[in-house]
């Protein structure tokens, strides 16, 4: 019997060996070991699933903690319910039992232990128990996301608890030292404000002044800066503040686009005039500009400057600090579009200053102003910068924009020579790809597109981070090959069309969420409609496949802020979770290559669940650009949905119907204008989701008879979307094309009408490449890309059909 069973076992083994077997299912434990734990719906679900607990959470979030407490057990056993009850007790102004529960939670440990200690300490403060508060505050780790608030409150409580004097002031400074030393990310000015108060209470007026001065001079962007300045003013006159510190303050304000504040600060810095002994008799803006050109040897091309003229520097250079002050004034005035005053300031720097970095930057901004103003002086200024400072990091910019100026001056030979120089001698330039494309474009516009293919091939082969240049190169290579070639044989023509078809299919199938993928789809529909339909069917099937059920944390698995964020989300504390997510150290995932895609997508997913759509889409847009361009995988599609969320969709659909525009087009404008931030403010003063200028908004508000309108109402999403959508609808009705409506939204309808008058016979793709403003050209491409992405993701893989024909208006 045993023998017969053994024979049967052997036969079964042979049969099983002969039959193909399914691959083994992945071992979850092995996957977790390699990729980190999988975090999906079960790991992120709200703790409070019972109706009573859900109702308690709702009451607490609605500001009715007493109602929440009536629905909660008096002695909870589970930690989540303890958290809910402790928060309700504190909100109901019952600090003693709340503190007891928070201390109990802190003893349990876990990712929220520091938060429990912090809240327990605040309860002790509410009780008036300073000693207990100090004991609890002292236990909170500096890694805690709100460690700055712990230190600031601990310092305040120390001042209240101890008698004023030098020892107390020193103790306050010791507590705040991690903030002063940069160990904790914090509002440093707020810390100086408290330390100054402690020193003043101790009778040390000058020590107090030093703290308050540091607060407003070194940290002018802080909300505490004005208070610190006011406190110092109350002490009366003190020692003078060095001009270099005030200049640094002005530059911080300028970099933050607080241009008027920067100009006000610069006007109070005492420096000698740059005109002493060196400025020309004609002190007008045009006089300064003419003198600057002469000083640099930047004369018209027929006069080749001698080396002595090019190398000319001021015989008696002006004070370097005064030069920086005037440079910054010129920069601020340029940003405020006060071009006449900016020219006067910058030309003085070019004429009278010798420090290479200051002088070259002044020349750069001066040339920018002339370029924006479409002045013929732009080209000579760019030439002067490139010749005078060939080793400057601005030299490649100068070559590129001098080439653009040459093109505007109808000098294609000079344009090509300058672009060749940039490509050959500045291999690491961030403008090299644009130079290669402009070299191709020069051939295209001259009617010799095939001769430009070599530049496109270089562009497609060049290393880049996100694939944009390869997309641009392959689209235009297809366009070139689809153009008839004189004397071309039928075989050569068929070969060219097949190569073009291959490039178009590559874009349509592999890069549907891109601008050039959108254009390629329209071309493929014309060239091979059957293949285009097949691609759309494949997209439909792709989008119907389920997303990944969970995301692996990978190298971020042990980050304490990630773990804390997950717990807070499960407790329903979205705002607190968003702070923890922002504190996650993403560098391990960034440096992991493609292995970091999933953890970074998880970060974006957590932001989305916390209600922070702006940061959710920013993570994908900035950190996952390569993944986003190729939505063929389930992970990429999940990332794409986070990058293109349907934020404010109800308002958008309502306004779009009234304005007669596609809702996805308005959704795209919101995404590109404000990154979905209702409180967005641009350097030029545009406000809110659709980034309307107040003057434009007032005009639209009058048409809509919106009574009581003020610029502040643009921060209301509903008002902003209504006004921005209505304005976009007016432009859409006027120009009858999404691309033209977008261009006019950015640059103004007058500019677009002028471009149409000059180049309205061009097809859409060429017209966009010919938009003379870099900002507007990029804006149109980005908005159309977003328009295509929203259509692709939420319309079963379909993309908008953009007509290539434009009618001049």
Where do the PLM segments sit?
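Mg2+-dependent phosphoryl-transfer active-site scaffold
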Residues: 722
């Amino acid at each position: 019997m045993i023998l017969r069973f053994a024979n049967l076992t052997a036969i079964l083994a042979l049969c099983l060996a002969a039959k193909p077997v399914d691959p083994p299912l992945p071992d979850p434990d092995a996957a977790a070991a390699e990729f980190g734990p999988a975090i999906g719906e079960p790991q992120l679900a709200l703790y409070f699933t019972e109706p009573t607990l859900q109702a308690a959470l709702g009451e607490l979030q609605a500001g009715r903690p007493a109602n929440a407490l009536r629905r909660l057990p008096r002695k909870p056993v589970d930690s989540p319910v303890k958290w809910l009850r402790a928060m309700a007790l504190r909100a109901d102004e019952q600090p003693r039992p709340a503190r007891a529960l928070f201390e109990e939670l802190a003893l349990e440990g876990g990712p929220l232990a520091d938060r429990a200690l912090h809240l327990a300490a605040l309860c002790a403060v509410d009780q008036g128990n300073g000693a207990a508060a100090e004991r609890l505050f002292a236990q909170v780790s500096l890694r805690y996301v709100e460690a700055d608030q712990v230190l600031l409150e601990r310092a305040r409580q120390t001042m209240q608890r101890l008698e004023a004097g030098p020892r107390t002031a020193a103790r306050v400074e010791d507590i705040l030292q991690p903030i002063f030393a940069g160990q904790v990310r914090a509002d440093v000015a707020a810390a100086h404000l408290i330390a100054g108060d402690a020193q003043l209470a101790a009778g040390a007026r000058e020590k107090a002044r030093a703290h308050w001065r540091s607060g407003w001079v070194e940290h002018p962007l802080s909300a505490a800066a004005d208070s610190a300045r006011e406190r110092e003013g109350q002490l009366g006159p003190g020692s003078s503040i060095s001009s270099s510190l005030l200049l640094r303050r002005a530059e911080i304000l300028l970099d933050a686009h607080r241009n008027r504040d920067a100009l006000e600060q610069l006007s109070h810095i005492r420096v000698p005039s740059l005109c002493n002994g060196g400025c020309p008799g004609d002190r007008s803006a045009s006089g300064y500009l003419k003198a600057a050109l002469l000083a640099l040897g930047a004369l018209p091309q027929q006069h080749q400057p001698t080396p002595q003229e090019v190398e000319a520097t001021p015989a008696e250079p002006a004070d370097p600090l005064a030069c920086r002050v005037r440079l910054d004034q010129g920069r601020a005035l340029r940003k405020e579009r006060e071009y006449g005053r900016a020219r006067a300031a910058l030309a003085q720097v070019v004429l009278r200053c010798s420090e290479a970095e200051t002088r070259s930057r002044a020349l750069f901004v001066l040339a920018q102003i002339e370029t924006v103003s479409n002045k013929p002086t732009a080209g000579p200024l760019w030439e002067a910068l490139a010749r005078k400072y060939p080793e400057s990091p601005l030299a490649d910019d100068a070559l590129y924009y001098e080439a653009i100026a040459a093109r505007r001056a109808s000098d294609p030979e000079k344009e090509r020579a300058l672009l060749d120089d940039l490509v050959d001698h500045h291999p690491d330039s961030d403008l090299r790809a644009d130079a290669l494309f402009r070299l191709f474009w020069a051939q295209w516009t001259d009617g010799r597109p095939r001769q430009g293919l070599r530049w496109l091939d270089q562009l497609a082969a060049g290393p880049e981070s996100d694939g944009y240049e390869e997309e641009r190169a392959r689209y235009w290579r297809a366009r070139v090959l689809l153009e008839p070639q004189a004397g071309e044989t039928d075989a050569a023509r068929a070969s060219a069309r097949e190569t073009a078809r291959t490039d178009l299919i590559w874009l349509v199938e592999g890069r549907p969420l891109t601008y050039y993928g959108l254009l390629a789809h329209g071309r493929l529909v014309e060239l091979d409609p059957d293949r285009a339909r097949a691609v759309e069917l494949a997209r439909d099937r792709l989008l119907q496949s389920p997303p990944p059920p969970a995301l692996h944390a990978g190298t971020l698995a042990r980050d304490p802020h990630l773990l804390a964020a997950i717990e807070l989300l499960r407790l329903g504390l979205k705002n607190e979770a968003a702070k923890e997510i922002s504190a996650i150290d993403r560098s391990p995932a960034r440096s992991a290559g493609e292995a970091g895609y999933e953890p970074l997508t998880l970060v974006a997913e957590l932001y989305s669940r916390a209600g922070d759509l702006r940061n959710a889409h920013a993570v994908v847009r900035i950190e996952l650009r390569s993944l986003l361009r190729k939505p063929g995988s389930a992970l990429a599609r999940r990332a794409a949905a986070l990058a293109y969320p349907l934020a404010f969709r109800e308002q958008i659909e309502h306004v779009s119907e009234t304005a007669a525009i596609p809702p996805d087009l308005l959704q795209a404008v919101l995404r590109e204008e404000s990154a979905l931030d209702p409180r967005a403010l641009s350097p030029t003063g545009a406000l809110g989701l659709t980034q309307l200028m107040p003057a434009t908004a007032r005009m639209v508000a009058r048409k809509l008879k919106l009574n009581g309108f003020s610029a502040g109402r643009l921060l209301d999403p509903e008002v902003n979307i209504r006004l921005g959508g209505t304005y976009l609808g007016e432009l859409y009705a006027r120009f009858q094309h999404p691309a033209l409506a977008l261009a006019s939204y950015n640059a103004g309808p007058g500019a677009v009408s002028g471009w149409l008058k000059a180049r309205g016979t061009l097809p859409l793709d060429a017209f966009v490449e010919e938009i003379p403003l870099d900002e507007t050209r990029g804006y149109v491409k980005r908005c159309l890309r977003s328009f295509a992405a929203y259509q692709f993701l939420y319309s079963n893989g379909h993309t908008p059909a953009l007509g290539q024909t434009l009618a001049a208006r």
